A protein has these predicted regions:
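Amphipathic alpha-helix from the class-I
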Residues: 88-104
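Mid-domain catalytic core of redox enzymes
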Residues: 1-76
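A glycine-rich dinucleotide-binding beta-alpha-beta segment and adjacent secondary-structure elements
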Residues: 60-64, 123, 127-187
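Short conserved micro-motifs at the rims of enzyme active sites and ligand-binding pockets
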Residues: 33-38, 75-78, 93-98, 190-193
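Histidine- and/or cysteine-centered catalytic micro-motif in compact active-site loops
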Residues: 28, 68, 87-89, 137
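C-terminal structured subdomain/cap of oxidoreductase catalytic cores
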Residues: 1-4, 11, 20-31, 79, ...
Length: 208
């Protein structure tokens, strides 16, 4: 970009905190009438965000489970494919984020955290460990590499503070013809808001 469009970004202005730890599970057998969406809460939701701000894996995370009853997502009627997500600190291998993240490439960390999430699910009444055929673990480091999101922070900048939602980059940039879309831009992260971000940019660009 031309230098006049490049604005220095300081840690106190743009802070990324939360990424996601994802488990993709292949399970034998079928769950009787599974809920498509399940949210398994820990004992204290507030402490989850204390851990994230401190840059450490959440001790007692909320676990989101998607168990779609969709024939297109499983090989046959005797198997299931689940998506599991917990909040996780952003990937920060060199401590460049001021201690606000974790080195998710550290040997053994991803698999250990995946085991812990499965144990938490079991403790909260959703034990699938004996049914597990295969799993893939995706960490904030993988998300950073795959999506180029800073630290794998899939929700963009921190949402702390009453004004945080208004500090996200606008969809129309100062550079003519350059538009911003996705979880790091207005209005924010998560599939519904990312879809809305795309709609806003579509309307800004106008018909071809």
């Amino acid at each position: 970009l031309p230098q006049r469009f490049v604005h220095p970004l300081h840690d106190e202005q743009v802070v990324v905190v939360a990424g996601g730890l994802v488990l993709l599970l292949a399970l034998r057998g079928r769950t009787a009438r599974p809920a498509h969406h399940s949210v398994l809460f820990g004992a204290d939701y507030d402490t989850e965000f204390d851990d994230l701000r401190a840059g450490r894996p959440v001790a007692d995370p909320t676990v989101y489970v998607s168990a779609p009853d969709d024939p297109a997502l499983r090989p046959d009627e005797d198997h299931e494919a689940w998506f599991v997500l917990v909040n996780a600190p952003a990937h920060d291998p060199a401590g460049e984020g001021g201690g606000r993240g974790t080195d998710w490439d550290a040997p053994g960390l991803a698999e250990a955290e995946a085991d812990r999430v499965l144990a938490l699910m079991a403790a909260r009444g959703l034990d699938v460990r004996e049914r597990l055929l295969w799993r893939e673990v995706r960490t904030p480091a993988d998300l950073a590499r795959g999506t180029r999101s800073d630290g794998g922070a899939i929700y963009g900048s921190s949402s702390d503070g009453a004004r945080a939602a208004f500090l996200r980059p606008a969809n129309r940039s100062p550079v003519p013809g350059l538009f911003l879309v996705g979880g790091s831009a207005h209005p924010g992260g998560g599939l519904p808001l990312v879809g809305l971000s795309a709609r806003i940019v579509t309307e800004l660009v106008g018909p071809a």
